[in-house]
Amino acid sequence: MFKQILVPIDGSATASLAVSKAIGLAQAFGSTVTAIYVIDPYPFTGVGTEFAYGQDQYLAVAKAEAATSLEAARATLQAAGVNAGALVVDGHSVHRSILETAQSIGADLIVMGSHGRRGIEKLV
């Protein structure tokens, strides 16, 4: 029924629950699961010049967090015997990036949490 499942993650507990749900579905249907982490490359538009974090620092932290989160998700999926992939996607519109990735990989299903962290909230 579901050959390719997409799981957007953000390092939150809610995203971890989505990975767990995707594992159950993947085991039931023999699916491959791809975890993605969307990084907004321009989160500071309209914030002002006195923001304590610079663009380069933000991107370095965001990429490191993406790598850590994706590796944890991939390890969890593989430990459960699920074929797993992982992608970092740059996109100013997270929901659009998720949908575009789902289309590009041929995802049959998107499993995601609804109350994770996002944007500047991660840095606070």
Stretch-by-stretch model annotation:
Residues K3-Y53, T76-G85:
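Small/aliphatic-rich secondary-structure junction motif
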Residues T14, V94, R118-I120:
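Short glycine-rich, flexible loops that bind phosphorylated cofactors or substrates
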Residues A18, A66-S69, V94:
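Hydrophobic alpha-helical membrane-association signature
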Residues A18, T45-G48, R96-L99, K122-L123:
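Short, well-ordered secondary-structure micro-motifs
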Residues E50-G54, A102-I105:
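Short, hinge-like loop/turn segments at secondary-structure boundaries
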Residues G54-T68:
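A short acidic, glycine-rich active-site loop
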Residues A75-I110:
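Structural beta-alpha unit
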Residues L109-V124:
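Glycine-rich, Arg-bearing micro-motifs that act as flexible, cationic patches
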